[in-house]
Amino acid sequence: MKALRIYAGPAARKHIERHGLRPQDVRTIPGAAGGPKGLILGPLDRFIFGRWLTQSSQQVHLVGASIGAWRLSTACLADPDAAFERFEHDYVHQQFEVPPGQKRLSPSQLSDKFAQSLEDFYGGRIGEVLNHPRYRLHVVTSRGRHILGREGRARTPVGYLGAFATNSLHRKSLGAWLERCVFSTPGAALPFGTRDFRTRQHALSEANFNRVLQASCSIPFLLAAVHDIPGAPRGAYWDGGITDYHLHLDYQPTDDGIVLYPHFQQAVVPGWLDKGLRWRHKALSLIHI
């Protein structure tokens, strides 16, 4: 199958050579940011969550940013096959009418419509996501610090200019402007190390789920930031892909398991601001993937 390529780190390759690629060995599944590129994985998502993983019973951590968080939240619904079909249909067919006298929708208008889309999709079903018997969901957002702590017409572009400049020198310096803020299924430990970047973890709940998912998908300047999420520190929360575009994380699977990473391209880019920094497009800690 020319459309599908499999890459494996040293430990994962040794494991697969010995046991084959088995659903019971999967411990973590990441879902990258990338907008509509994530839809490429639709048929694979339906196979993995609708047919393949159902042959096993172990706990699996799902780590997603932006559209990856949306995909993996959908995987936690009771009928993932049907849920993914609806997710793809709704994403492709969404239309936003521009009011008379406007050339385009403002970020706040787009955010309001997106919030309603999430409510229409997950309304009455958040409990299915949070109480899934096997899947532990981790939604990555980017929380602004200092000048980016609140959104503003002047402070946001100035803040992101500073973030871009310092990130180009050293990725860890981005933590002066933004921090990784992960919202997880209550009681679930993070399945990756956090020494690489400033990180917080908070619990997902019925009260904050939609706002967290909206924040994880809120691309700066296109959508408005989500402010003051319940159960987390005050501040502006943006797209999780800013800090973790392709979830280039220090995964730490347990029990000799592996990380299965369905991805839409060969390159793994650490952060959104690293897209133009090609020397960072490489695998640093992918031993278990």
Language-model regions: role of each:
Residues M1-H61, T74-H288:
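Patatin-like phospholipase
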Residues G64, G68:
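Gly/Ala-rich beta-loop-alpha elbow adjacent to hydrolase catalytic centers
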